[in-house]
Amino acid sequence: MKNNIILESNNGRRFKLVVDDNGILGTKEVPAPCRPGYEVKFLVAPDLVLNSDGSYKEEFKNLFTNFALKGTTRMSYYDTEDLSLNKAGWTIRIRKKSNKKAQQCTFKKRYPNINKTSVLKQSNVDKALNVALKEGFDTLNTGFGNGCEIDYGYSKATLSYSYDLDIATTGKGNVDIPNQEGSIAFITANAPSDLTLPLEGIREHGAVELTSYSAIMDNVIEVAIESMTIKAAKNSEELETIIEVSFKLEDYAGEIIEGKSDLQLVNELREVLYNLLHGNGYLLEKDGLKTTAVLERY
């Protein structure tokens, strides 16, 4: 009789019951969709939350508790002039965080606009995960199998799989990243097999710097407040400041209700943050990816 019994662990990995040649029962791992993490992101109006010197206004900071500087990040993206990688759902990022020791290279595969309405549904998530599963992004994928994340914005959600590599250890307290030549050499030598697009002609888009603050919302979850000042448009000398307020589900420290799914909890917390920002007049009612802005303007 053919064995079709599949066991699933708490982290979403799946195992099939098998019997070896000696009649001993065991398990064999089989491909399964990754269990996604969630990051909720909203944009706020810089002129309403910042003082003239660039510091955050007290009334905005008072929406949260434990508002504190977390660090700075310098980053560049690598793509062709016509952004052929991004158009195919791929991004390559080089970055260094001031509170981390190592420079990092990230290869990311994105599945954009997975939701049909502004509130993400489980059916949207499951459909996107199964599309990715058919393309080899599963729990057995050597580079990308450790997890995936859903970026959940004002009206759009994107499923992404990341493959992170350390480039060099330069210590904390700096945001030094390799130059274009060194970055391209590392990217070319370490590109995952899943990325089958040609890398000839890629160049640096950036570099830009990000300043991050952390705070606590509703006494249950850490939020990040990140600001980035970049070109307002390609070849423009004018600058634009983008400020994003976000949280990751993994930073939730409140009560876990049995039977409540990750997405149900995310939607509840998202509503709290939305009401906080919208109710105080800070929310920008639009989506916006920092990645896209840097790629298109540099």
Kindly give the residue locations of the regions a language model identified.
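Extracellular repetitive beta-rich solenoid segments
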Residues: 2-31
